[in-house]
Regions:
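Boundary regions of SH3-family modules and the immediately adjacent low-complexity/disordered segments
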Residues: 177-233
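Interfacial segments of multi-pass membrane proteins
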Residues: 80-87, 266, 391-406, 412-416
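Hydrophobic, membrane-embedded alpha-helices of multi-pass small-molecule transporters
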Residues: 16-32, 246-259, 276-277, 312-345, ...
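Short, non-helical or kinked segments that cap or interrupt transmembrane helices
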Residues: 42-47, 64-77, 120-129, 274-279, ...
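Membrane-embedded helical hairpins/re-entrant loop segments and their flanking transmembrane helices
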Residues: 3, 7-16, 38-59, 330-403
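Membrane-interface helix-loop-helix modules in multi-pass membrane proteins
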Residues: 65-100
Length: 527
């Protein structure tokens, strides 16, 4: 084999050592990489495949010199969840938003190449990027708590449901209410169900079904042909077929236990295990869930050892262009934040290895690699890709900076994508386990935003920073559902980002009092 090809494959290291260290990088990235699809409803196997191939694309573009792994970006979780919820779990619309994010990376890559790094980052002062990260984390808070407090279950075959959002004749998924108790029709389960599993009930039949006439027109009542679809309990009732009071305290116990385990690992564990507190927390919460009878192994039993990932291609089926616009405006603006994060990640990576990757191979190349990886992932139905700080931590801990170990980690990820049992196990993880993990992760996202403000010494005694932060936070959090103009909905995240950038450019850096005080000081100094 050609010597240069051998060095690219093994990085000049022994094959056995490179493979072992590559496997360690898999453990470092695995928990976070599969957590994003677990929290958003995307397919875990598709995610692993996309991140593996995305990492190889990144290494090809960056000349194979940057020891980085492309993992699932947490910054996009809120936006992905919003799109998935609005359009009944249709991941193909998410793909449009993810691809738009990748295209934005390509544009930023060209801009960096043309104008230089400093000219581009001037549009994103710390007060804007810090507040954007805080907004992202805070918008995720309801998702975290819903995983803890909401008991989920399947609507049984033969049940009558009321379609409250969507058209079963046109949409793949519709939002339904299942009024399971005729004596208490205000207690119901609601959630997204596949339209193909529903059959329209006759008007007379619908009128007499569990008091539905008081809540809907008969034409909205349907019969469930096949059990399935995750449903969310809106109001607790002991008569509910999916919940009991005992079940609810078990959910809280599992969530709190998961949080405690993660905190203990982060503070008191040393060595390799300190790098994977999230994965350890998930395993611990999963084991407790098994003991409490909360785990359904059906997905594990039915999964084959070898399986093809279930792709959600962006152009599959009829396209609702208003949904595409919503997905793009909801997801793509987050690239503004992740662009700054990318610069920080590459800088941190270089600080660990002793190389300035912003200069060689250049920030424009790392952005290009990240953008192409994200576009590929969006096309297949995966999440946005980002350079993982978890793997930078492994580099620092092992002091082995061989980029080839990351390429082998990518190959391991690709192989795992075709192991069906892995996807089955991930699908069987109970909601309270992910809820406990989410409390930690989503809170930390907002904390990172606060840290950015502190590290950059953003002075909140100045009106400039107060106004920008205040307006961004109120619009970003207050318009969490976005603004709808006609058939197009623009996300609150996008609105906050645009307002922050505009205000940072048009507002004077100092108000009248500050300018007067500065002038007085200059006058005094001149005497």
């Amino acid at each position: 084999m050609d010597r240069n090809k051998t060095n690219y494959l093994w990085g000049g290291d022994k094959p056995g050592r490179t493979l072992t260290l590559g496997l360690q990088h898999v453990f470092a990235m695995f928990g976070s990489t599969v957590l994003v699809p677990a929290l958003t409803g995307l397919n875990p196997s598709v995610t692993l495949l996309c991140m593996g191939i995305g990492t190889l694309i990144f290494h090809l573009v960056t000349k194979g010199v940057v020891p980085a792994f492309m993992g699932s970006s947490f910054s996009f979780i809120t936006a992905i969840c919003a799109v998935m919820t609005k359009y009944g779990g249709n991941a193909s619309y998410v793909g449009w938003g993810i691809m738009a994010s990748g295209v934005l990376y390509l544009i930023l890559s060209g801009a960096v190449k043309l104008f230089g790094v400093k000219r581009i980052t001037e549009f994103f002062p710390p007060v804007v990027t810090g507040c954007m990260i805080i907004i992202i984390g805070m918008m995720l808070a309801p998702t975290a708590m819903n995983n803890v407090t909401t008991v989920r279950g399947d609507v049984p075959q033969g049940a009558t449901v009321v379609v409250t959002q969507g058209d079963p004749a046109a949409d793949p998924f519709v939002f339904c209410e299942y009024h399971y108790d005729a004596d208490h029709p205000d207690s119901f389960v609601s959630g997204w169900l596949p339209a193909e599993n529903l059959a329209l009930k006759a008007d007379a039949e619908a009128d007499e079904t569990n008091g539905l006439a008081a809540y809907t027109n008969p034409g909205n009542a349907y019969t469930v042909l096949k059990a399935g679809g995750v449903s969310m309990l809106s109001e607790a009732s002991e008569s509910s077929p999916t919940v009991s009071g005992t079940m609810r305290w078990k959910y809280w116990v599992v969530a709190i236990f998961t949080i405690i385990v993660i905190v203990l690992v982060m503070f008191f564990v040393r060595g390799f295990f300190k790098l994977i507190p999230i994965l350890i927390g998930i395993v611990a919460g999963y084991l407790l869930s098994i003991a409490l009878g909360l785990v359904d192994f059906t997905a594990v039993r039915e999964a084959s050892w070898f399986t093809l990932p279930k792709f959600s291609f962006f152009a599959a089926g009829p396209i609702d262009w208003s949904a595409v616009v919503f997905a793009i405006t909801m997801i793509a603006p987050i690239s503004i934040v992740t662009f700054v994060e990318h610069v920080g990640d590459i800088t941190a990576n270089g600080a660990v290895t002793g190389h300035n990757y912003l200069e060689e191979p250049g920030l424009h190349r790392t952005l290009l690699g990240c953008g192409l990886a994200t576009i590929f992932s969006g096309m297949m139905g995966g999440p946005a890709a980002t350079t993982y700080s978890e793997n930078t931590g492994v580099l620092a801990a092992t002091k082995n900076y061989n980029p080839a170990t990351l390429r082998f980690a990518a190959l391991f990820a690709i192989i795992l994508a075709f192991v069906g049992k892995v996807s089955g196990v991930l699908q069987s993880i109970p909601a309270p386990v992910m809820g406990g993990v989410s409390v930690i992760l989503f809170g930390m996202i907002s904390s990172v935003g606060l840290r950015m403000l502190v590290e950059n010494k953003v002075d909140f005694t100045r009106s400039y920073n107060l106004i920008i932060a205040g307006i961004m936070l109120v619009f970003g959090l207050g318009l969490s559902s976005g603004i709808t103009v006609g058939s197009v909905t623009v996300s609150g995240t996008a609105i906050a980002a645009v307002l922050g950038i505009i205000l940072s450019k048009i507002l004077p850096k100092k108000d009248a009092d500050e300018r007067r005080e500065e002038a007085a000081q200059k006058a005094t100094a001149g005497k």
